[in-house]
Amino acid sequence: MQLVRGLHNLRPEHRGCVATIGNFDGVHRGHQAILARLRERAVELGVPSCVVIFEPQPREFFTPETAPARLALARQAATAGGEGVDRVLCLAFNQRLRSLSAAEFVDRILVDGLGVQHLEVGDDFHFGCDRVGDFDFLQHAGVNQGFTVEAAQTVELDGLRVSSTQVRNALAAADFDLAERLLGRPFRIAGRVLHGQKLARQLGTPTANVQLKRRRVPLTGVYLVSVDIDGQSWPGVANIGVRPTVAGDGKAHLEVHLLDFAGDLYDRRLTVVFHQKLREEQRFASLEALKTAINADVAAARALAAPSAHR
């Protein structure tokens, strides 16, 4: 899978493709259905498949303080590579891009930039300044510009429309079984381990500080997790939140303690898979009270993880 950042990095060899456009936040089963159809059309036409995404996502640009928590960063839409996509075009969503009319978007990005032969979109897709572009607009543009358009049907699960919002709702309710069914895989967060204050080590429970490059996260609290490291899975306990007892920066942090693990994790990339919520994050009156709570969390995680430890 090739990642292209910005229209200015498109080359002549990138022209001629089938494409889809969207946030693809989390690449849930609805997205997967679109990508599966995209692959089919790519094979039929004998051209590469391309996913067009935006960073930041439009709602983060317009209302950053109230935009929903991201399930994954745009660069992690490289998950699409696991869905058989040949190329991801990541466009910076800025004032210039948001000002493009629907017609300009089609001309500059789809036709001049990508040379689109076929476009696959969701049934509720809108684009262009003030979101005036829709499926009907694309169909008319396709007739004039020489590309076809198809709208993917809504994917439902037990009568529920599969969407990123529904995934976030499931995560907020700590319903990881439902989240997994909506996503088609367990919910996970991947990131690199950074050096921290080493306070947890002083409290007797060393943790890996996993980098979170996002304003908001869809989870908060203490969780039973498993951590994938070089193909091996380790059970653990994770805290995700603002660390109210020891930090005052208001930023989200992900700290993971691996059960019975001995080794250096700094600068390594971990994938944290969430299984069960143990408790809410809370502010403690003292570090000693925090230590007691952490020990209880570890004991609870150990008891729950015992049947499947160290897979």
UniProtKB/Swiss-Prot annotation:
Pathway: Cofactor biosynthesis; FAD biosynthesis; FAD from FMN: step 1/1; Cofactor biosynthesis; FMN biosynthesis; FMN from riboflavin (ATP route): step 1/1. The keyword Nuclease does not apply. SUPFAM superfamilies: Nucleotidylyl transferase, Riboflavin kinase-like. InterPro entries: FAD_synthase (IPR015864), Riboflavin_kinase (IPR023468), Riboflavin_kinase_bac (IPR002606), Riboflavin_kinase_bac/euk (IPR015865), Riboflavin_kinase_dom_sf (IPR023465), Rossmann-like_a/b/a_fold (IPR014729). It is an enzyme of class 2 (transferase). The keyword Zinc does not apply. GO terms for biological process: FAD biosynthetic process; FMN biosynthetic process; riboflavin biosynthetic process. It catalyses: riboflavin + ATP = FMN + ADP + H(+); FMN + ATP + H(+) = FAD + diphosphate. Keywords: ATP-binding, FAD, Flavoprotein, FMN, Kinase, Multifunctional enzyme, Nucleotide-binding, Nucleotidyltransferase, Transferase. Its EC number is 2.7.1.26, 2.7.7.2. SMART domains: Flavokinase (SM00904). CDD domains: FAD_synthetase_N (cd02064). One of its GO terms (molecular function) is FMN adenylyltransferase activity. Catalyzes the phosphorylation of riboflavin to FMN followed by the adenylation of FMN to FAD. Belongs to the RibF family. This is Bifunctional riboflavin kinase/FMN adenylyltransferase. The gene is ribF.
